């Protein structure tokens, strides 16, 4: 697992905005007015217009395992006459999929996979957070409230332009410089 800083670096370094998001793991605020006030008088000393401002809560060095989640969002149509449901990839997913590599890992029993990850992390004395990534557009109040209540959720929000990724993430509470390898039991 790479840390969040790795993915941020993908867009900053290579202008790769397919995989990397330069605002991943931080709270992004757009078109903000920042006021600097005198502590004693509460008078505004300086007012600055900021097209973009970020707050970093310290999760950039945390390792994250990112997965595409194939789910009801991939449903192509209503149930067919014979009771089958048709699923497929969106044109955007088809266009960007090759950017993520030439291999795919299919997890058939997601609950069992998560249980094994949690067990392996517990054996190593590590805490983790997991969940679907949510996507926001502009100054989204739900996004701000969620991150205010749980700052670690900055790792579980991305800009709406990345919604085709349909990500599920596991974030480990252990700052690292580059990558982390979790030893766990898998049945093949």
Regions found by a protein language model. Give the residues of each.
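NAD-dependent ADP-ribosyltransferases
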Residues: 1-188
């Amino acid at each position: 697992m790479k840390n969040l800083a790795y993915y941020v670096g993908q867009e900053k370094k290579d202008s790769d905005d397919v995989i990397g998001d330069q605002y991943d793991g931080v709270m992004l605020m757009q078109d903000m007015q920042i006021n600097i006030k005198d502590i004693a008088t509460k008078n505004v000393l300086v007012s600055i217009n900021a097209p973009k401002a970020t707050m970093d809560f310290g999760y950039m060095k945390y390792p994250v395992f990112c997965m595409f989640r194939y789910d009801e969002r991939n449903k192509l149509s209503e149930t067919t006459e014979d009771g089958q449901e048709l699923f497929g990839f969106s044109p955007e997913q088809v266009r960007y999929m090759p950017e993520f590599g030439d291999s795919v890992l299919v997890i058939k029993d997601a609950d069992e996979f998560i249980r094994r990850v949690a067990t392996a992390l517990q054996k190593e004395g590590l805490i983790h957070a997991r969940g679907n990534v949510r996507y926001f557009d502009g100054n989204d109040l739900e996004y701000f409230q969620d991150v205010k209540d749980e700052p670690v959720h900055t790792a579980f929000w991305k800009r709406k332009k990345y919604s085709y990724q349909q990500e599920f993430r596991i974030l480990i509470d252990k700052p690292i410089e580059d990558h982390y390898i979790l030893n766990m039991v898998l049945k093949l």
